[in-house]
Amino acid sequence: MVKHLLPQVRQYFKANLHTHTTISDGRLTPEEVKAEYMARGYQIVAFTDHEVCVPHPELAEENFLPLTGCELSFNSWEEEKFLRKAYHLCCIAKTPENRWQVYDPAYKGGNAYLYADSIVCDGYETRGYSLEQVNDVIARTNAHGFLVAYNHPTWSLQEYEDYAGLQGLWAMEVYNNHCHRIGYDDNNSHIYQTMLKLGNRFFPLATDDFHRLQEHNFIAGGWIMVGAEKLDYPSVIAALETGDFYASTGPVIHSLDLEGTVLKLRCSGVRSVKVFTQSRHATELMHYDGTLLEEAEFDLAPWLDCWKENGKENEAFIRLMLIDEHGNNAYTRAYWYDELV
């Protein structure tokens, strides 16, 4: 029996799910953002301007899908700015016309305050740096028909105690290109791993967090490849909800299948393939002569048997990271024990 861990569809669509325009603090208009991303082979962009949810149906066409969204902040205002912690959440609407959000006018979001009259909310509410409040907002945003992602914890100066208690997340950024390009080590695979081990069944994102064009490659540095049946809003949201995508800063995954207990990968040429789990079980495949890998196989039977024998079925998962010759990575989501047997 073959399980397709990544769906076999006609086409995978390239997406950036964290984008800012002149509606908030970006330098390009929504129309200019669309043009720049289409020129780089993207079909999907989530417009997630700070503090205001603005749909862009005027940008939709056969080969381009705009997703409605916004980015919300929760700041530790009492700290000096250079020490200020923050929670940032990207909220992506499951339907294109949905613009509900929580709103606190203290968060200006660049030009977003100019759109205050168009905001759909349940009234003004004060937001501060509180895990309890963040979880409440996540729960209400989920209930109003959004997917909620946790953004750039390294840029946000966050530690284990800040993120360990987060609940209800759909995804998190394992890579944020903007933060990386301005000097932060926002490769957050280790935080994703920690949150998986805490029981969060959620997905990894690589995003641009796009604000502007600049000489240091501030665009097309991180993306996801979405295995949707077609390029329309319901199909793409369905694929996002079920984790039918992978994140990348370079490598391409052509297929990821499980034949019995043997994991089979086909991909673009990479230097290394790593398999991580919740436990000491881990492995890496690479050619030490420098030859690139385009396929890999791993027999999971010993691990699966061990986890079952020790009653760890509810905790166990695998996930893959691919590293190419330039140091760029691709990340699969975690596949849990009950998906592997």
What residue spans do the PLM features occupy?
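A metal-dependent hydrolase metal-coordination microenvironment
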Residues: 2-147, 151, 158-160, 165, ...
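Metallocarboxypeptidase
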Residues: 169-215, 221
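Histidine/acidic-residue-rich catalytic or RNA/ligand-binding cores of hydrolases
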Residues: 25-28, 159-168, 184-185, 212-230
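C-terminal functional module detector
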Residues: 1-8, 12, 199-203, 208-341
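Structured loop/turn residues at beta-strand edges in well-structured enzyme cores
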Residues: 40, 167, 313-315
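Alpha-helix boundary recognition
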Residues: 38, 142, 196-197, 241
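Glycine-rich loops and low-complexity Gly/Arg-rich segments
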Residues: 39-42, 70-72, 92-93, 98, ...
